[in-house]
Amino acid sequence: MTTLAYRRDIDGLRAIAVIAVVLFHFGVPGFTGGFVGVDIFFVISGYLITSIIWNQRQAGRFSFVDFWAGRARRILPALFVMIAAVLAVGWFLLAPKDYEELGRSVRYQVMFVSNLLFMRQDGYFDVASDLKPLLHTWSLAVEEQFYIVFPLLLILLSSRLNHWRLALFAVLLVSFGLSVWAVAHHPEKAFFLLPMRAWELLAGGMLAVAPRSQWRLTTMWAQAISLAGLALILLAVLCYDKSTPFPGAAALLPTLGVVALIRANGHQPTFVGRLLASRVLVGLGLISYSWYLWHWPVFVFANYASLDELGPFDITGLILLSLVLGYLSWRFVETPFRERRLWAGRRQILLAATCGVLVLGLAGQALRWTDGLPTRLSEQALQYAKAKEWRPELMRCLADDKTPDDQLFCHYGTPTPTVSTALVWGDSHATALIPVFDEGAHQHGVGVMLASSPGCIPVEGLEHEAQCARFNRRVEQALTRQSVGDVVLVAHWSLYLYGDVKGDLGHVLTDARGRYDRAIAEQQLAEGLQTTVRQLREGGHRVWLVKEAPLQTFSPPYRLSRLAMLHRPTDDVGLAVTEHLKRQAFISQLFTQLAQANPGVTVVDPAPVLCDEAGLCRAELGGQSLYTDTNHLSEAGARFIAPVLEPLFRRLQARAALGNGNANAAN
């Protein structure tokens, strides 16, 4: 047998995969585990690709060049058209920094390594995932890397070893072991890298090279295995969510589910197989690749351009739009190339692929050279958009494990260390306030030292990551050696209690078993902060507790820039003060209690200067965005809250005059 028989049920499986992914990405309730659709695609690809290679190998006509040309013909035309369209739409919608980042994504994707880029960008300050139009191409990069490596591995093992199937299975087990280990230690690598994903593709591959004599099942067993396979997939789609450690062992459910369905329907269709082979599912399966390509850019650009949160009707319309674009891509791009109506020869398709890589790669590089073409925007829109960018001077003050001790602190104001009488200690919200601390220190002739680490609450014992615990210990140890009288604690406090404004619970405080409970988190913060304040006071330090600025439910730079491009007013953009007070109720009560119980504790609240008498906590003032994102103040925003920090600087100034910076002066 040299030709791979077409199986309608596999196209039906593709439909299940793409539906799950699309509904998950669009936030449709009930599909919290829809991301496993990618894993379904991996297993199917592994099975089909291995079948193609092995059948041609058995027939004595396998060619690496022909194989790679076939993959290029199948994958690249639709991908390149989508990328070109995304670049065109980005011209009209994206802020310069985001357009530059899109160009970077394009460069990495045409080189088949976008998964490496997005793995590195899976950080605290990177552009939110729903603002990266090509984020979904990471899975294509994984498959493309597999297509390069796997044929070589399969041919090598099958030609050199008698028990090559066992060797291939051993590779699968090693990959699975790496995935399980990486989920616990390096989750971003587990998610994005081929070595930790290869076992899913190899699971399909092992099925393809299994001796056909082992395929036959009784009707009863085939029906049972088929039902079990579908149940495993649905269980993952409906029960998994973003908190599920993934892939690792959790990916066994969709992987084994797909293997079971392909295996059970290999010789005779089961009830589930006939369902998968239905006209609707097969039709969706046929366009699944193109639909997958288009659904994410549609969602991202809609989010980017929308001035309001997308509602159910918006979501429905966008899903249908992505489906239509997917169909058009399949009909007018995929099919002509697959049927060899365009560039039929091997040399032609490889030459066209090379040209596509060069053209798109150079276009992406040009966006880097031109800083995202800022001249596309009006001056006001550009001013708003720039607010999302952090200056390198601020980024350098974000410490991590690699930061040497002599660079743990950033110093502002009076350069003499003995006069640095205040320490600002916190997470990235402390970093965001550098402009106001820098200017205040210079204006008052005092010194300020700042230590901050992203996502690290400045309360010992509450750190959710080991590196945060190490950072806090280093700060505490340095504090005993420094001439510091005042300690200013700054953090995104509500993040650790309730998650971010979008509901991401990645940084919340949890119990000993890793479970989140709001009441327990509040109790942990209260006890931990009380202990920290007591220890600082016992060390002779005055403590300043800085409450967080009102959290916006949208990204002000994006919203304001879009409004400016549409010539619409921006003076009513912000958050209702009632919403701010509601979210901050427990934190406000806790801070007030700490201050009332100890005269050496002062509470600093930015809200009174950010919220007006009309009850609006503004996101913009004087043509400038006060925020870089939903929660970090921009440089303009940081300077705007200078009045609430004036008591701190006056105290530092008075202490410097009394004791030349002595930590115990006027304590």
Placement of each model-derived feature along the sequence:
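Membrane-interface helix/loop caps of multi-pass membrane proteins
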Residues: 1-343, 359
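Extracellular/periplasmic envelope-modification machinery, especially enzymes
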Residues: 242, 306-317, 323-327, 331, ...
